[in-house]
Amino acid sequence: MLSLPPPEFYKLWIINKSPYQLFNIYRSGIMKVKVLDASAIIHGYNPIIEEGEHYTTPEVLEEIESKKIIVEQALDFGKLKIMSPNREYIKKVEEVVKKTGDNLSQQDIGVLALALNLNAILYTDDYGIQNVAKKLNIEVRGIAFEPTNKDFIWRKICEGCKKLYPVDYEEDICEICGSPLKRKMVKSRLKKKRKKK
């Protein structure tokens, strides 16, 4: 079921957009809620000049000193809101992060949880965040770079015999040959089977 549009949707009526045009704009995602991580703001995303509702977390604000003026203006104009996600969504993200092995900070997890909480589009150039977002079916858009289309997980790999271990494997030495282990990105997407002619 389609939820009611945000206030910006109705403001567009004033500039003589037809109801049909307005509805298409809303459905296209322009007016959808957007969550911004630190990389999105640092790489030039400006909530003041963009349509839609923008949110970020308190932790992100601590990392974006270089864009402090823009952020403060966006907050003053009501174009950016600060919100912490509900704990249940943080737990969901943490479960996925544990499976993928992505090395994400609590700030990264918070941004993902907020996007999940608000059913929002997530703006980020961080490939680790994008990877976890895919697993959570969160729509992602990049700013300076196109979002990665790769689907991967992290594993530990033996430098000697190449045996793979889960990323949370506690030892740093291979149980088979005794060589050291290192983290490695592994594709998790299965290759599609070719159809028989």
Curated annotation (Swiss-Prot):
**UniProt: Zn(2+) binding residues:** 158, 161, 174, 177
Its Enzyme Commission number(s) read 3.1.-.-
**InterPro entries recorded for this chain?**
NOB1, PIN-like_dom_sf, PIN_dom, Ribonuclease_PIN, VapC_family
Task: Quote the record's cofactor note.
Answer: Binds 1 zinc ion per subunit.
Give the UniProt keywords, A-Z: Endonuclease, Hydrolase, Manganese, Metal-binding, Nuclease, Ribosome biogenesis, RNA-binding, rRNA-binding, Toxin-antitoxin system, Zinc
All copies of domain PINc, residue ranges: 35-141
Provide the family line. Belongs to the PINc/VapC protein family.
**Entry-linked HAMAP family:** VapC_Nob1
Please identify the protein, giving its name as recorded: Endoribonuclease Nob1
Question: Could you tell me which species this protein originates from?
Answer: Methanocaldococcus jannaschii (strain ATCC 43067 / DSM 2661 / JAL-1 / JCM 10045 / NBRC 100440) (Methanococcus jannaschii)
Q: Which gene encodes it?
A: nob1
